[in-house]
Every structure is written in structure tokens, then in C-alpha cells.
Amino acid sequence: MNKSSFFIAGQHAVIEALRNPDRKVLRVFLTEDAKKNIHRKNPRKNVLEDVKVYFKSKKELDKYTSKEQLMHGGYVAEVEHLDQPDLKEYIKEKKNCTFVRLDEVTDPRNIGSLIRSAASFQIDGLIIKERHFPKDSKLMYKSASGCMEHLNIFQVSNINSTLKNLRERNFWVYGFDARGDKDFTEVKWEGKNVLLFGSEGFGMREHTGKYADFFVKIDMSKDIESLNISNSAAIVFHHLSYLKKKSWLFNK
């Protein structure tokens, strides 16, 4: 089956795509300096060996990113989408795992930044509605800084039925809301969990929130109304990563 191709831009996005054996890279457009940098960063393997490489000036590369007003840094690539992981298969053998679910979060920069944080702190995956996911967005790939290659992204057609099915499989669903019952650090965070985040402007929709078992919040200054969604998520991911590491050291 032929997969649709699209363009990505930026040093980290392009280099990590080249390093990923599961990512088909069709063509790479580079400045001479960018090519040298790729070889410096990959001294043991020529990641450009099986790829069509075209050398361009920065001005020539601008045409690929001018619409998004994106800085390419001398790196542009045409790639195919990765195979989609299957959520049901993934959770079959898992005793402990954490997923993130975004509700009405559509800004590609925010999604990309959140993906970067999730991959950095070893979250198991992102669950997102197919039609709300900007899967071809250069902005998202640039904001993710190469982490699109390191996080499972589960695209589903019906979020509510997915949450219902996960709850039936012993997942706890935590909705993050400024009016939550308690601070998220008071939760033990054991077993299987789904972290449910709403959009910055509108929060979580009521009919999605009804699938949450608990509502929790991030305690912060009363003078500040809210945090950016990607910042909020990064705080939570770091805390969960810390607890996981602490538990591992304790049981070592």
C-alpha cells in the first residue's frame, strides 16, 4: 500500500527521521553546511546513504517553509507516515502504562511541544482523534524537535468509546482541570492511567469529562489563570517520571 508523503523541516526533525529505521525518507534537501553537520552528528553511520539528497541554498529551501513562516535551518525532507500502532495490541501485555489524551487541542505547536515532553519523560503514548491531528504539519514536527520518532501516537476515530474501553480494562482516567478536587501530586500514580487534557481556551468538553474517574489540578499562584497546555503537561510528565525512577530505586 502506498503511503502519502509530506514535508518536514528543521535540523532535529530531519535528522531523527533519518535515524529512524521505521521511517521512509524519500528525499532530503540540504545546504552544504547542513550535510556536514549531519555527518558530524552521525560519525558511525551514513544516514544519507540510501536517500536521494539534493543540495540547495537557504533561499531555495525557503519555498518549502515560507507559508508557515518556519525556520528550516538548512534541512527539509520528504517523508512517509509511520505505520500506526494498534492501541488494543499495545495494552495487551502491559501492567503499568500511561497515555495522554488531548481533547480539542489542535494547535500544532502545542501538540509538538507536548509530544517532545512526553517522549522525554517516557510516556507510553498519545491518544488523539484522527481528524483533530495535524499529521502533516511542519510546525508540529519542528516543535517536537525529532520526538515524533520516539512516541507512540494512537489515532482513534471515537475518543469517548476509546476511553470507555480503557476504563473497562482497568485504566484510571484523570481529567486535568483548574477546578479539580486535589493537586495531581497527591495521587499515587500506579498501574494504568490516562491523563486527559483539555484545550487552553475552552478546557475539557463536558461529554468527554464524564469519562474521567477523577479531576485533578496543578497547584499554582492564584494570580495566574492558567498555563500553556504543553507547559502543564511537561510538569505532570516530569513528576510521573520522578515517581517511576524513585520506585525503581526503592525496589532495586
Language-model regions, residue ranges each:
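Active-site/ligand-binding-proximal alpha/beta "capping" segment
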Residues: 174-228
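Structured adenosyl-cofactor binding patch, chiefly the S-adenosyl-L-methionine
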Residues: 120, 141-145, 209-252
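RNA substrate-binding interface of SAM-dependent RNA methyltransferases
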Residues: 23, 48, 92-182, 250
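Short, ordered loop/turn segments at secondary-structure junctions
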Residues: 33, 58-60, 131-133, 179, ...
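N-terminal positively charged helical leader segments and presequences
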Residues: 1-89, 249-252
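Short, glycine/polar-rich helix-capping loops at beta-to-alpha or helix-loop-helix junctions
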Residues: 40-41, 133-139, 202-208
